[in-house]
């Protein structure tokens, strides 16, 4: 029933609408935030902002309150109705079922408002419910407090008003009580009688008209009633329709009980929880407090807006303790926040029930926009004095006691806090809306506020359920479903029974009729017969008198029968008319009810909305609201403050700023003054243009640093802010602040510029000196390979011979890490494996085996140098070979040491016998791979394969690349590919000892020990690993001359060209093409004629032969070493902790330094040449030692302490460990330590130290033609500089544990053969792979799957070191061990320790000082790469905008701007 009347009050014409509504609503649950409860987004909007038709959609009583008039509401609730809104997305929370029928009549008038439609002003009182009001208050005192706090005017003191409020019938006083200290105004006259204030459902539907606090309801409705869980059950569009039944999707209740849209109908976010835009609603923008915003969960952000701009009374100040009480509401964000913030449910509980759970309500004071948290935000604050509310409650509940239980149905929940002994005291479900949501807080939602949101019908246990709190919503739901099913079953059964009964009745009636008819017929017949029989007896003379009684009776019977017959036929019927009355019953009142809802809608729209129209203008700000979100960024603005200085500069640019003014008056010009700009702010009004200026600022950030300077024009934007004074401007202003804030963040980014420094690390990359050599490789480098030749002699140790046998196993070596097609494993190392070679036969290597014999031809490999010519000629061949790691010459020799791996590698060496196969020697040309570095890269040797014929000589070769090169004969380079580097990784752990000095000492000890004859003899077999020295030394021509790879390359190229292959020799030629050409018999013949085959490089392969290395008694060796150490006074363990550093391994420079500094300098010699691993070839040429070192530093090697000794660098990382602990550990775990030490010693790098340059093995290159081919294939892949060469087989891990992260073992990163290029990978993967010891450490294992003990050893060492820091500790205490580790450092540079180590040793011996010069090159490399990172720097430029942010503040000076800012802050606070 809606009655509208106008009256004048205080000279103000007020239209009061008295809405009498009977609303039966059951709020099953609040919609989750972000979802609209009933999916009607419209519900919230009340016909445009223009009409502030406030529907106080209180749960209990939904009344329309016409904002235009003050609203007085009497709500009497009678009966409960459960409405379920299917549309609502609300989770059903068991706890809250708001089921109540509220009959409320409100008079809505805004008294004291300057105009009926004026937006209410809110007194700057904070509305905070405080549960502290424990004492019951008389209604009068409560009202008085409320009036005092809320009413701006003194009118509240008027006695008549007070009396009015006190009227028992009307003073349910839904408006929540407030503490005087912080409360939002509550209409003093709220006479909302929500008699059914069921626990959480009691909603204060009040609207505050700030202007007229005394008005019954200010424009803001307190529709806080909804427990969070039960936010408007479903809001129907009715709000606009004004059918108040927002909650009921069914719309049964005309008044939407729930979800009171704020005065801002538009915000009515209540209705659509989903509306985030309404978020501002929360904090109602100017008085547009979508009080119901609570309802819109989606507006969680709105809650942030909570403190909307001034006058943001969060209408839902009413808080229900139940909500606050549920501590468990994990969904508190959704429900509690909403409940507390938006809907503070009145606690209908006993007044004194303190809110057990302090829910902090954030309420923005109208002015400050600060958020006050009433600590006992518990809803209890709204507790009504018992006498008033309690009475009403009692009255309301009297109607339906069973529903008295919490709306949420969990009285128990409430009881948990303060057991409400009487139904009256339903605590609002603590969960209140605790939103159990689905995952709502467990708790509580007390009634599962979230889940069912008080979802009456669904989740909450009925009030009468004794276990309301213990039954989870789903149990109730299940129970309800089962109950419904049962009822349905009964219903259908009854229907069926009824049908059967009906049929039976019909049957009986039919039978009875039949019987009666039959009887009648018989009677009729008998009567007729009787009459007819008697008639004759009647004489004509008979008179009536003669009819005796019998005759008369017969006639009578006859007539009666006829009448009966007629009657049965229906001829006599006609009385039915009365039944018409029955028809009248057809129209049922129920339908009538729907009509009533319609009525409310029209009423709502009338006058009330009109007033809100003004607020509608505020709605525009609402648009800004989204900007408000940027406001969040605004905080960045503070960062901007530092910017201010920048802004000063911008001031200069202020000139540009003037452009901003263009839009508006010159005012923008002042920006130059910007310091003064604050004052201009006011002038801002033109600012509207200003905002554009701001946009310009945004552009500046894009510019990055420079544009930042342009930022100054941004200041003009500030003037624009002045413009913001225009209401519309405000939004713009907000936007500006936000933008500024963002730039601020970028400012922070600015520091990223530092990244450029990282570029320096890139220099370290240069360290990959080898890379630089690579370029030269094409020609000059070959010379270096000659150096490797010396190593070759070591290879000669004959140990290679053994490897030869193993050469076959080498084939497995190939398996070791092929990344795919590139099966080549660094042949070099295999050299020793050569012995293993026999296995080679199993694989393609088998063929290589024969080549093994040709291995000697390896020397021819030297012709591989001609391969270098390839490079020079087009560098395609040399590059290919280098990339492939194929060593034309003996390079394989170094691999020899690796021999052990060799087994894993192609068995080729084994085949040595079949030197004939040596023919593969042709691959030797790849030897050009050596490119610039004299040190032979294993790869290049491959080409020498042609020398294969000499393959007989290959015997030496066997040691070299044996297994790996597989087809060394094809190209000693295969040995290069072998690059056992992987084993090396273990070494790094040694570095740990941050004790750089100690690290050197240790290295010294170990070096001495290893150099000692007995150890060297003992370990000689081990040498195989060195294979890596792929860089076969100089190739010896048939004439015995040192053959220059470049020459060989040139010759081969010339030959190929003369053979008509010239076109294919272009630099663009693929490795496959070159390989194909090299494989040609004629080419092989040619190469054989010119190549002797890889020289001794294999020498290292002490393992050679039968793979003695594998059979080596590491336990014994470890004991020797330990004894040696102990005898040398070296203690274990102290350094232990450092272990981690090992990974870093030693930088190239450090290693060089260490080696040079060590006594074994002679042993180590300057292997520098390894750099040539030029496999990268060109890359090498561009990389200097400095570059490499810088790279290593960048890769983290830099962290390694200066001590050149490889150990030193690792040391830093080591520090983490506790040396003492290590020593203790060593003592306790001597066995483990010994095993680790053994693994470490057996690691290629250490072995290389021990063995010394494996060079001699080179010869083994010859092994297996097939291997060579495979090597070519493999190397070609690796040559891609994917760094696949060694580690490629393992995939990104790299043999050495991702020796190069992504890079191949030797290809480190993109790839130098030794990883000198380090590209992304870094030698040992220190760069990307995480170091051989890194996560990819297993790669070793993978690469050599079981083929080499070294792989396993390396893995073991790397893992154990990293995991236990054992060796690292040892490195600490036993500087010596670290020394070997040093090689690991190199590993970063080079995939394979052993080869690299030997190369380095040779290089150092020959070029002990060379490393220095590379350092210079390093300088060149550095910064550039890192520079790229510099880009981050651009972000820095945004920084300048930050200052603008400050200017934005000036904008804030503009009142509106300030307001916007405040909103922002508000949004943030929530």
Curated annotation (Swiss-Prot):
The chain crosses the membrane at residues 477-497. This is Collagen alpha-1(XVII) chain. Residues 1460-1470 have a biased composition (Basic residues). Residues 498-1470 are extracellular. Residues 1-476 are cytoplasmic. Glycans are attached at residues 1273, 1395. May play a role in the integrity of hemidesmosome and the attachment of basal keratinocytes to the underlying basement membrane. The keyword Hydrolase does not apply. Residues 597-609, 827-848, 891-914, 940-949, 982-992, 1166-1175, 1201-1215, 1253-1262, 1434-1443 have a biased composition (Pro residues). Residues 1-573 are annotated as: Nonhelical region (NC16). It is a single-pass type II membrane protein. Residues 9-19, 1446-1455 have a biased composition (Basic and acidic residues). It comes from the Eukaryota. One of its GO terms (biological process) is hemidesmosome assembly.
